[in-house]
Every structure is written in C-alpha cells, then in structure tokens.
Amino acid sequence: LLAKALADDRGSGRAICYVDGQPASVRHAALLNACASHTVEFDDIFKDGGYHPGSPTVSAALAVAQDRGASLEQLHRAIIAGYEVGCRVSLAIQPSHYRFWHTTSTVGTLGAAVATAMLLEAEADQIAHAIALSTSFAGGHQQNLQGDGMAKALHPGHAADAGILAGIAAAGGVTASLDSLHGDKGF
C-alpha cells in the first residue's frame, strides 16, 4: 500500500526498491525496503536493547551503497558502525525507553545515520553531527506499535529515511547540538 501511495515520489537513483525490483532514489528505496522487512517480521533482534537494528540500518546502508557504487567492504563497515552505535544506545536507554517508544524507530534513526555518514566518507566530527541530527528526527511511539493500524511497519522505514537525511546533512556540513544524546532536554 505504501509503495503505491508513494509511487509519484520514487525519484531517480541507483538504489533498488526490493518491493518491486526497480531503481529509485536512496531515501525512497530505504524507506520501502525497511517497511517491507519489518512488515513480515523478517528482521533481526538485539534482545538486550529491545531493538531490531537490521530493518532501518541495513536498508539505509544498502540503498546508499548501491547509489554510490560503494564496495562490499565499505557497506559492511557502515552496517557494523550503525549496529554498534544503535545497539549501544539501545542498551543505555532500556528498559524505560520502551515503555513509551518503539526502539527500532527511535534508535534505528541513529544507526541509519551512522551507516549513511560512513558511506559518504564523513569525518568523525561529521558522524557525531549525524548522530546528533538524527536524535531530532527519531520518533515512533508505543500506541502505534501496540494499537490498531499499520503504523508499526512504517517505523523502521521512517528511521531509515530520517537517518539518511541526517547522514547526508551532516556530511554536507550541517551541525547539531553534540550533547543531544545526554543533555537535559535531549534524547
């Protein structure tokens, strides 16, 4: 349903949207691929963090890597970095975070941002800003996870899309508050 609803927003690019096997823009492909992965509950789990890192992180990394023509090594390094950051943050915020928030959606945004920034060959300070920016884009509450409707499946798609936005912006020089994870009014 989402692929049909977003058909006019496909854009152009070399990322593959596995929903239909056609090329699309990076953000379009990542969004739909992450949603599809989570819809069929075909994603991994980091149980200690209550987090499914694969849907948002791998979907973002794969789309960016395909579009940029990145090597398999670059893709692997980006995914590993995205997992490392996402899983560590998920450990730090649980179990209280999951009471109101869907960790895959919130923390997934951070993992996707790191993977994207890595593939864009961002410097360390830019990767830090990608994380900081992504904390402002993180969302996905428990009501839509546990309640009626189809919103749950969109959570990792939004995380992948928002993470890509954060990674691209930071690699392009956009900055954010570097205490956004641990500040009094931060994540």
Predicted regions and their residues:
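N-terminal core-entry segment
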Residues: L1-F187
